[in-house]
Each structure stands twice: as C-alpha cells, then as structure tokens.
C-alpha cells in the first residue's frame, strides 16, 4: 500500500537511517501530520505540498505521497491521455510486465528476449537496507495515522 511504500522510502532516506527508531518515527509522523493539517487549514493544499520549508521542518516527507496534487499540475499542462500511471506495487511485482505495458502505451516495439532478460537481472532499487530491517515494521498506530492522513488524498487520486 501507499503507507507501506512511504515507510520504506522514509527508512531508506540517509538522513533518517542512523537516528530512527519505531518510537521516533511514530512521533515524527504525528508531528508532521499536525503541521500539514494546520497548513491545510490556513493555505491551499498545493501551497503546503510545494512548501519546501514545511517539508524540511516536518522531518517526515508526507508530501511525497500526495500524488494527486502533482498529477493535477501535470494534467493542467498535458492531456491526461498522454500519461500512463504505474502503481509501485505492480512495478515491484513484475518489472517486465510493467515495461511491456509501458512500451505498448508508447507504441514502441515490444521488448526482445535479451532486453527482457536484462530487465530481470537489474537489482531492485530503494529497498530497505539490511541494517534498517532490524528496526522492524512500523507500529500499527503509526500505520493507522498515515492511512487516515492519506485516505482522502488517495480517494482524490483515484478520481
């Protein structure tokens, strides 16, 4: 899910890796959500999402999961039919399948077996490092906070 993907990305962030604990992560998430919700009450969502200072102050990169705002900006410049949206979990599940669909969408010739084999040999990027897995899964309470925060944004994304 988006929340799990967010956790993976925050854990792999170099700034976080050495100082993060489950308790620290839960605290940072709570404070960040409060900061963004306060901003959303006083400013436009777009301003809050693009506010680099807010992002740096919050300590947790919540804005990276607010995809619909970024897509809305892209759609205001380019036609929607020029976009092919890929879910991270689909990409992770089957890289080759995803690229076949992208090639088809772009009207490119399908991959040959050599290129398919090469794609399957590429190591996965942005995965949790071994030392970071020692921290374990995020707390259920933290997960629920993030799910609650992202839910309305994910609903807008689906529209």
UniProtKB/Swiss-Prot annotation:
Keyword Cell inner membrane annotated: no
InterPro entries xref list: CS_Sulfotransferase, P-loop_NTPase, Sulfotransferase_dom
One Gene Ontology biological process: hexose biosynthetic process
Signal sequence annotation: none
Recorded topology in the membrane: Single-pass type II membrane protein
CC cofactor: a divalent metal cation; glutathione
Protein name, entry field: Carbohydrate sulfotransferase 15
Organism listed in the record: Nototodarus sloanii
């Amino acid at each position: 899910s988006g929340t799990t993907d967010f956790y993976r990305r925050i854990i792999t962030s170099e700034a976080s890796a050495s100082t993060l604990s489950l308790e620290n992560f839960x605290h940072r998430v709570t404070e960040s959500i409060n900061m963004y919700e306060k901003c959303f009450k006083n400013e436009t969502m777009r301003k809050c999402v693009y506010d680099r200072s807010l992002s740096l102050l919050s300590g947790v990169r919540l804005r990276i999961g607010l995809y619909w705002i970024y897509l809305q900006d892209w759609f205001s410049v380019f036609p929607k039919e020029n976009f092919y949206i890929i879910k991270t979990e689909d990409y992770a599940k089957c890289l080759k399948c995803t690229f076949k669909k992208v090639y088809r969408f772009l009207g490119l010739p399908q991959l040959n077996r050599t290129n398919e084999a090469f794609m399957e040999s590429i190591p996965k990027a942005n995965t949790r490092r071994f030392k970071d897995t020692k921290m374990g899964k995020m707390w259920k309470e933290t997960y629920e906070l993030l799910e609650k925060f992202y839910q309305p944004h994910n609903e807008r994304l689906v529209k």
